[in-house]
C-alpha cells in the first residue's frame, strides 16, 4: 500500500482570475444512468459566509492535475483558505478516516466516493449535501445524502499504440482483450479497494448483463491476461511507460497524459459500449473546518465552479451540473459521439459485496496472482 503524502500544488503561485476562465461552449455530459433517486434526507447547504479563512484538509484520490485545478480555482474565490491535500486511493482514505474517527484530521473527501458505495461509509461522513444538488443532470444527484456528486468517470481502455502495432493487434472491444497475445499485458487495479477498478467491473456487468453467466464467463476468460497493480493511476501511467499494452482505466487520467504530450497512447472506448459512474465529495463527520469544507463542496458542484474547472483543465473531466459549460478546446470525446450502455446502479450497489466475492474467488484460481 502506498504511503500517504501531501501534494505541493502551486498554492503560492500568483494567478490572475482569467486562469480559471476560458471560452466555453454548451454543457455536455454522459447520458443519465439508471440511478436511485435522491432520498431527500439530507439538509441542503446554507449560504457560505462572505469571508472564509483558515485551513482545509482535503483527502483525495484525484490526479495531481485535477487537484491543481481545484485548488487554483478555489483559491481565486477563497484566497484566505489554506488547502492541504492528502492523496491516496479511496480504500486507503476511508480506512484512514475510520481510524481517525475519534479525532478527525480531514475535512472532506473528493474523488473515489461513488454512487455505488451506498451507505457503507455513513459512520465517517456527515449527511449533508451541496445546495446545488438539484442542478445535477438526471440520474446523478446524491444517491443517499452522504455524497455530493460532482463529476463522472467514464470507462476507457488506455492502449499503447507502439506495443499494439508490434503485436499486430487493433484493440477496439472487450472481445479483443481476450487475445492470447495479451496474456499478462493488461494492467488493472484491485476492485476491492479501487473505485476505478470497480467502475470497470460495473461496465463489464452493464455490457454483458449484471451478474449474468455471460459476464462471469467473460471475466474468467479475461483474468489470465490481467496483472493487478497497486494503484489505479498505474493503469494509464505504466501503459504510457511501455510496461503494458492495455490499461483498464478511466478517461480523465488517460486523457491528461495525451494532453501533456504523450504520443504513444490512445483512448479506446469499448466498442460494445461504455458507461460512467458518478463520483463526488463528502463532508467528514466532525471534521475541524466544516464551513470551509462546505464552501469547497459547493464550489465543486456549482455551475460556476465546474465551468471554471473545465476551462482550467481544458475539458479533461466530465461534470454533473446541468448548467456548466464545456470549453471549446475540450480534450474529451463529446458524449454524443460515443456509444453508451445503461448501468443498473441500484442493482450494482445492492450486490457489490457479492460481486466482489465472486471476483475474488475467480482471481484466486486464475493462477496469475
Question: Where do the PLM segments sit?
Answer:
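C-terminal motif of bacterial Sec signal peptides marking the signal peptidase cleavage site
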Residues: 15-19
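Bacterial signal peptide processing site
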Residues: 21-24
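Short, polar/charged alpha-helical segment
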Residues: 47-52, 57-82, 119, 157, ...
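Extracytoplasmic ligand-binding site segments that recognize negatively charged/polar headgroups
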Residues: 57-68, 90-91, 105-243
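A ligand-binding cleft/hinge motif common to bilobed small-molecule-binding domains
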Residues: 115-120, 245-264
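Periplasmic-binding protein-like
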Residues: 153, 181-192, 217-222, 228, 261-285, 299-323
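A bilobed periplasmic-binding-protein/Venus flytrap-type ligand-binding module shared by bacterial periplasmic
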Residues: 158-163, 205, 277-289, 299-300, ...
Amino acid at each position: 500500500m502506498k504511503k500517504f503524502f501531501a501534494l505541493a500544488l502551486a498554492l503560492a503561485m500568483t494567478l490572475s482570475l482569467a486562469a480559471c476562465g476560458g471560452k466555453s461552449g454548451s454543457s455536455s455530459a454522459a447520458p443519465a444512468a439508471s440511478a436511485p433517486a435522491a432520498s431527500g434526507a439530507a439538509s441542503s447547504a446554507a449560504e457560505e459566509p462572505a469571508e472564509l479563512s483558515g485551513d482545509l484538509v482535503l483527502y483525495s484520490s484525484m490526479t495531481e492535475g485535477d487537484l491543481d485545478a481545484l485548488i487554483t480555482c478555489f483559491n481565486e474565490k477563497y484566497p484566505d483558505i489554506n488547502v492541504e491535500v492528502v492523496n491516496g486511493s479511496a480504500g486507503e482514505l476511508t480506512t484512514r478516516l475510520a481510524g481517525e474517527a475519534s479525532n478527525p484530521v480531514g475535512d472532506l473527501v473528493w474523488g473515489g466516493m461513488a454512487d455505488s458505495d451506498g451507505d457503507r461509509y455513513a459512520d465517517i461522513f456527515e449527511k449533508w449535501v451541496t445546495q446545488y444538488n438539484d442542478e445535477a443532470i438526471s440520474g446523478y444527484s446524491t444517491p443517499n445524502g452522504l455524497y455530493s456528486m460532482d463529476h463522472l468517470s467514464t470507462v476507457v481502455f488506455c492502449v499503447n499504440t507502439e506495443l499494439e502495432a508490434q503485436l499486430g493487434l487493433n484493440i477496439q472491444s472487450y472481445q479483443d482483450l481476450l487475445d492470447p497475445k495479451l496474456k499478462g499485458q493488461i494492467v488493472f487495479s484491485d476492485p476491492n479497494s479501487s473505485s476505478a477498478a470497480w467502475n470497470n467491473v460495473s461496465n463489464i456487468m452493464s455490457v454483458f448483463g449484471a451478474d449474468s453467466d455471460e459476464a462471469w464467463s467473460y471475466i474468467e476468460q479475461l483474468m489470465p491476461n490481467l496483472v493487478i497493480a497497486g494503484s489505479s493511476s498505474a493503469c494509464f501511467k505504466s501503459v504510457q511507460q511501455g510496461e503494458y499494452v492495455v490499461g483498464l482505466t478511466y478517461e480523465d487520467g488517460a486523457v491528461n497524459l495525451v494532453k501533456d504530450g504523450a504520443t504513444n497512447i490512445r483512448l479506446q472506448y469499448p466498442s460494445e459500449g461504455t458507461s460512467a459512474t458518478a463520483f463526488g465529495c463528502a463532508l467528514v463527520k466532525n471534521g475541524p473546518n466544516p464551513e470551509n469544507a462546505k464552501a469547497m463542496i459547493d464550489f465543486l458542484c456549482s455551475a460556476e465552479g465546474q465551468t471554471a474547472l473545465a476551462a482550467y483543465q481544458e475539458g479533461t473531466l466530465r461534470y454533473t451540473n446541468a448548467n456548466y459549460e464545456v470549453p471549446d478546446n475540450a480534450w474529451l470525446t463529446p458524449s454524443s459521439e460515443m456509444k453508451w450502455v445503461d448501468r443498473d446502479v441500484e442493482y450494482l450497489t445492492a450486490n457489490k459485496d457479492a460481486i466482489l466475492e465472486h471476483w475474488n474467488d475467480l482471481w484466486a484460481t486464475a493462477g496469475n496472482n
